[in-house]
Design a protein with these regions (language model features):
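A long, hydrophobic alpha-helical segment
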Residues: 43-55
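Amphipathic alpha-helical segments within well-ordered protein domains
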Residues: 51, 92, 134-135, 151
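Residue-level detector of well-ordered alpha-helical segments, enriched
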Residues: 59-66, 103, 126-133, 145-149
Length: 167
């Protein structure tokens, strides 16, 4: 009986070990320390791909949260929370960042230059996120780049939830 119990325990330990090996990586956990470095790290490998997809007129991989960020409180997934901007000050810092601001302007320009609609490029859910992002940065930027995307893609209509969160 004792041998059977030990064998069963060993089998359970092996199964647990292999389940750990095969388990998918969990989504990032929300954190209190919101350094912009989280965006730089996330964009390191994916930004060139994201830009290529927008220029080709079709988003096919998953990068919307850290390429076109929106305010925290609009999305409920771990990624939306983790990459959500805390407010207008963090949005200003994002836009002023030498890497992040340059990339956001570049990929936003690619959206403007596309002959595709936002829905064709991003699909329904991510089009909503794009509108939130463009609304936020149109409030922050001194130029009209982000407002021009709102005009082109959303008939000039800002995202009301973003404006509400901004106060």
């Amino acid at each position: 009986m004792e041998l059977i119990a030990k064998t069963m325990k060993s089998i359970k330990e092996l199964l647990a070990f292999f389940k750990k090996k095969e388990a998918p990586k969990p989504e990032p956990k929300p954190r209190l320390d919101h350094s912009l470095e989280r965006f730089v790290v996330a964009q390191e490998l994916m930004y060139p791909r994201a830009l290529e997809e927008v220029k080709n007129g079709r988003k096919v991989t998953h990068w919307i949260w850290y390429i076109f960020p929106q305010l925290k409180g609009l999305g409920h997934s771990n990624k939306s929370i983790y990459y959500g901007l805390d407010g207008i000050e963090e949005a200003r810092a994002f836009l002023a960042h030498p890497i992040l601001g340059t990339r956001l302007r570049e990929i936003t320009t690619a959206v403007l230059q596309s002959d595709k609609t936002a829905d064709e490029i991003f699909g329904g859910i991510d089009t909503i996120k794009l509108r939130s992002c463009m609304t936020l940065f149109s409030e922050v930027a001194e130029d009209d780049l982000f407002g021009r995307v709102l005009l082109k893609c959303f008939e000039g209509k800002s995202d009301s939830k973003t404006l509400e969160l901004l106060g």
